């Protein structure tokens, strides 16, 4: 399977994964959805780094990674709206998107640096996979939307 074919399969499954994630985000706790989406994304990246890159292995990766590729957006938008209000959700998500781009640039630079040192992208895939799993656990630390905020009281 060529890189272009793999990316095409990812894109096709991304379409369905994102729509399904939107449907799920209207019905379930978005923190748990993000936990599963980031966790499965991390496992997909680690799987890719350990695979033999055969047609079947790349197809399995492309399907699972595609289903999850943009699936984090609907629950993230819902959490932003719940925390900051619907009128500010767009602004907040814009900042999240900007931060995402800075992270992507840093990750691309880091992957290139690792490639030049190790002559392979495998360490970069494994680090990205582990970071996704850390993100999955971190999402569970978010306060459940609709619960009261703790406000310090004067003594």
Q: How would you label these PLM feature ranges?
A:
Residues 57-71:
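Hydrophobic core of transmembrane alpha-helices in multi-pass small-molecule transporters
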Residues 71-84:
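Intracellular juxtamembrane helix-capping segments at the cytosolic ends
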Residues 11-19, 101-105:
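Residue-level signature of mid-helix packing/kink "hotspots" within the transmembrane helices
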């Amino acid at each position: 399977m060529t890189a272009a074919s793999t990316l095409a399969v990812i894109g096709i499954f991304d379409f369905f994964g994102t729509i399904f994630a939107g449907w799920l985000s209207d019905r379930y706790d978005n923190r748990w959805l993000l936990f599963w989406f980031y966790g499965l994304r991390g496992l997909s990246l680690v799987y890719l780094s350990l695979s033999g890159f055969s047609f079947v292995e790349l197809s399995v990766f492309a399907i699972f990674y595609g289903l999850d590729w943009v699936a984090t957006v609907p629950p993230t938008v819902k959490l932003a709206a719940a925390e900051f209000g619907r009128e500010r959700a767009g602004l907040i998500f814009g900042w999240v998107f900007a931060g995402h781009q800075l992270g992507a640039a840093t990750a691309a630079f880091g992957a290139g640096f690792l490639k030049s040192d190790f002559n392979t992208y495998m360490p970069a895939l494994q680090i990205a996979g582990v970071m996704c799993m850390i993100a999955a656990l971190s999402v569970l630390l978010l306060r459940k939307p609709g619960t009261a905020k703790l406000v310090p009281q004067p003594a």
